[in-house]
Amino acid sequence: MKMIRAILRPDKVEEVVDALSNAGHVALTKMDVIGRGKQKGIRLDNIYYDELPKVMLLLVTPSEEIDDIIEIINETAFTGNFGDGKIFISPVEEAYTVRTRSKGL
């Protein structure tokens, strides 16, 4: 199993979630976050914004589905501009469902 953390532009998130859902990847968590990447914030007129609002999607999925999910996120979230986002992949050793106390996804 793998965990995907995708940090994306807020205005692209619903489109990404819909695309993932249409491909059968429906289980995820969304969180509003703030942060910055290599661009170190943004200047608009005389105002400098050190950190920008983003949304983080968390998905835990079987390892064999990773490439499909990454492709969907990359294709759907892409604008070609700074701040499109980042995708991080981590291993997940185990997962449990609290309601059923079952192990696995």
UniProtKB/Swiss-Prot annotation:
Domain of life: Archaea
Keyword Transcription applies: yes
SUPFAM superfamilies noted in UniProt: GlnB-like
GO biological process entries: nitrogen fixation; regulation of nitrogen utilization
Record carries keyword DNA damage: no
Record InterPro entries: N-reg_PII, N-reg_PII-like_a/b, N-reg_PII/ATP_PRibTrfase_C, N-reg_PII_CS
Signal peptide: none
Keywords from the UniProt entry: Nitrogen fixation, Transcription, Transcription regulation
Pfam family, one: P-II
SMART domains in the cross-refs: P-II (SM00938)
Entry's Gene Ontology cellular component terms: cytosol
GO molecular function list: ATP binding; enzyme regulator activity
The family this protein is said to belong to: Belongs to the P(II) protein family.
Chain's role: Could be involved in the regulation of nitrogen fixation.
Protein name per its UniProtKB record: Nitrogen fixation nifHD region GlnB-like protein 1
Protein's organism: Methanobacterium ivanovii
Organism classification: Archaea, Methanobacteriati, Methanobacteriota, Methanomada group, Methanobacteria
Gene coding for it: glnBA
